[in-house]
Structures are given as C-alpha cells and as structure tokens.
Swiss-Prot record:
This is Crossover junction endodeoxyribonuclease RuvC. The RuvA-RuvB-RuvC complex processes Holliday junction (HJ) DNA during genetic recombination and DNA repair. Endonuclease that resolves HJ intermediates. Cleaves cruciform DNA by making single-stranded nicks across the HJ at symmetrical positions within the homologous arms, yielding a 5'-phosphate and a 3'-hydroxyl group; requires a central core of homology in the junction. The consensus cleavage sequence is 5'-(A/T)TT(C/G)-3'. Cleavage occurs on the 3'-side of the TT dinucleotide at the point of strand exchange. Its EC number is 3.1.21.10. It comes from Ehrlichia ruminantium (strain Gardel). It catalyses: Endonucleolytic cleavage at a junction such as a reciprocal single-stranded crossover between two homologous DNA duplexes (Holliday junction).
Length: 160
C-alpha cells in the first residue's frame, strides 16, 4: 500500500510517499519525497494551480492508495491562516479528483505516535523518523512533517 503524507503550505507543500507491506505494517519504506514550491511573485491562482497539477502528477505516478495530513490549526496571523486554508483547499480538491481518501490527524497525535510525546520538538520527530525508516532526516521540515503524518497514519491502521 502506498500512502502519501502531506504538509500543506502555499510556499512549500511537503509530501512523502511511504510504502507499507499489507501483511506486516512494520515494513515501512520511504519511496520518494519532495516539496511543491511556489513563487510569491505569482498570483494565488497560479500558485494553487501549480500545487494542484504537481500533486495530481505525484498521485498518479506513485499509485497512491490513501493520504494523510495534519488537521488545520489557526495561526495568530490571520493572513497566514488564510493562505494555509487556500493551500489545504486545493489539496483536498486534488485528492478528491484523484479519488484518494484522506485521513487527518492533530499535530499532537502525529508527534505522540512518532515520539511518544505530543509536544515533541521537530528535531525529536526527525530523530525518530531516522530510526523508524533507517534514513537520514534531511531537507526541510515540510518534508519531515509529511513523513511523520504518513507514519502516524500507518500506525493508526496497524492499531486496528
């Protein structure tokens, strides 16, 4: 089964494809990851279109079965929250167009499932990702956050 974890952002949407063995949920493998980058010099419509088209291409290329994303949170800055909502909206639309079910988790649940601590720092989450997947946690936090939410989803499936 292929699961995509998504960390939404209008500037840099992180994504990670994890593959898990249907018979052994402890066999988790990182297939690929990256960021969908948009320029703030473009219109919001152009930026959302880029997120839509790139994510749709990723979903089709990797035959994704399910998606996971952190639940929305409201930032103290209303403009930042609004831009995040735009990005989330286009991500939800893209997943719906591709007929991929979405599972959402709170940030605290993601951190707790990965580290055992719902208030863990990003460095602690990266450390655990390295141990779980036997990889070097590199790149930006948008990618590690995407990996973390995908692992959280796998652990949630495994619990049932």
């Amino acid at each position: 089964m292929n699961i995509i974890g998504i960390d939404p952002s209008l500037n840099s949407t992180g994504w990670a494809i994890l593959s898990v063995n249907d018979n052994n949920y402890n066999e988790i493998r990182l297939v690929n990851n990256g960021s969908i980058l948009t320029s703030n010099k473009k219109t919001i419509g152009e930026r959302l279109n880029k997120i839509y088209s790139e994510l749709l291409n990723i979903l089709n290329s990797y035959k994704v079965d399910t998606a996971s994303m952190e639940e929305i949170f409201i930032n103290k800055n209303p403009k930042s929250s609004t831009l995040l909502c735009y990005a989330r909206g286009i991500l939800l639309l893209t997943l719906d167009v591709a007929c991929i079910p979405l599972f959402e988790y709170s940030a605290n649940r993601v951190k707790k499932s990965i580290t055992g601590n719902g208030h863990a720092k990003k460095e602690q989450v990266c450390f655990m990702i390295e141990n779980i997947l036997n990889i070097k946690c590199y790149g930006t936090y948008d990618i590690s956050d995407a990996i973390a939410v995908a692992i959280c989803h796998i652990y949630s499936i495994k619990a049932f």
